[in-house]
């Protein structure tokens, strides 16, 4: 499929002439070597354009996250830790606190800064069970602050979330994220 390979337009007369030359055995207007060089040049330019677009989107995502976290730090009830992780207590529990290697059972909802939801255990009607050493750094640090029964909102800078590469297909590079986390049980 030409569209999926990045070819957005084609000169149909030239294309038809090339196909006709191949099918009839005539001498094409452009040699196979020249055609290969033209395609190599085209795809190199396309790759450079896509890379520039991705870098611009990454820079915008990073700036958006930094601006949000700076403004969010001024809000009442929001605590900013030295790592840059921010949190707000919604409900304070009184049960056990986990360590960095604890297995925990949590309900959570993850959203982008614009409020778009990307994951939710609530939607699945089943809490998640995981080791705090098997999740993003913002979760490892943040959930340790909680006691069983607590519900916090975390504001996680990109470097404590999915970093400069993101999670392909799910989380863009440099994305700061919001999570509402309810610590049900330390296992």
Q: Can you name each region flagged by the protein language model?
A:
Residues 1-187:
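Cross-family detector of peptidyl-prolyl cis-trans isomerase
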